[in-house]
Regions:
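Amphipathic alpha-helical segments in well-ordered regions
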Residues: 4, 8, 31, 72, ...
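Carboxylate- and glycine-rich phosphate/diphosphate-binding segment that chelates Mg2+/Mn2+
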Residues: 1-61
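C-terminal catalytic subdomain
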Residues: 64-120, 126
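Alpha-helix N-cap/helix-start motif at coil-to-helix transitions, marked by capping-box chemistry
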Residues: 15-26, 60, 83, 98, ...
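Short alpha-helical scaffolding segments that buttress acidic/His motifs in well-ordered protein cores
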Residues: 1-5, 48-55, 89, 125, ...
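Amphipathic alpha-helical interaction segments
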Residues: 19-23, 27, 47-50, 68-71, ...
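C-terminal charged capping/lid subdomain of soluble metabolic enzymes
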Residues: 108-164
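A ubiquitous short alpha-helical element
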Residues: 12-19, 90-92, 117-121, 141-143
Length: 164
C-alpha cells in the first residue's frame, strides 16, 4: 500500500505509473484485510499479488519520505521494512497530503471513501494499521527517540526523498 501511495504522490506526471499506483492501491485496500483474516484465501492472496505487483511497477516513478526514512532506520536498527513503512506512513501523509488535494481525492475515491478529504484518508490508513495491530511509534520496535535528527539528516540524502 505504501508503494502505491508514495508512487502516486510523486509530483512527476507519468500516466502509466499513476494508473498502476491507483489500481494497486485499490486492490491492496480490498484484499489485504481479507488476506490477513484468511491467510489461505486464494482470491485474497491473488488480489494482493496483483495489487503489490502494480504498486511495484508504479514506484518506477519514485517514492518519497516514508521510504527515505525507512531506509535509514532499517540500515541502522535492522527493522523490518514493511513494518517500518507502515509506522511512518500516517505521519508523512499528514505532511504531504495538504500539498496534494487532487491526489488525495483520487486515492480516497480509489478505495471507495465517501469523504475524499485528507483527514478521512489518513483515518482510513490508521484504522487499517490498528486492525492489523501495527505499532504506532518507532520506539515500539526498538528505534530510540534520540536518533531523530541523525536519521532525518541521512534520510534527506536518500534518493526517495528527492521525489517526495
Amino acid at each position: 500500500m505504501t508503494h502505491a501511495i508514495e508512487a502516486y504522490l510523486v509530483p512527476d506526471f507519468h500516466p502509466l505509473c499513476d494508473g498502476a499506483a491507483i489500481q494497486g492501491l485499490s486492490l491492496v485496500n480490498k484484499w489485504l484485510p481479507v488476506a490477513v483474516q484468511e491467510p489461505k484465501n486464494i482470491s485474497a492472496r491473488g488480489g494482493m499479488l496483483v495489487g503489490s505487483c502494480l504498486a511495484g511497477i508504479a514506484f518506477l516513478k519514485g517514492l518519497g519520505l516514508v521510504h527515505a526514512i525507512s531506509h535509514m532506520i532499517g540500515a541502522e536498527f535492522d527493522t523490518q521494512h514493511g513494518l517500518t513503512n507502515a509506522i511512518i506512513l500516517p505521519k508523512i501523509l499528514e505532511y504531504n497530503l495538504p500539498h496534494t488535494p487532487e491526489g488525495t481525492r483520487t486515492m480516497a475515491s480509489a478505495i471507495h471513501l465517501k469523504d475524499t478529504g485528507q483527514q478521512s484518508f489518513i483515518n482510513h490508513i490508521n484504522a487499517l494499521l490498528d486492525d492489523f495491530k501495527i505499532p504506532t511509534s518507532l520506539s515500539k520496535i526498538g528505534v530510540p527517540t534520540d536518533c531523530v535528527a541523525r536519521i532525518a539528516t541521512k534520510a534527506m540524502q536518500d534518493s526517495a526523498a528527492k521525489t517526495n
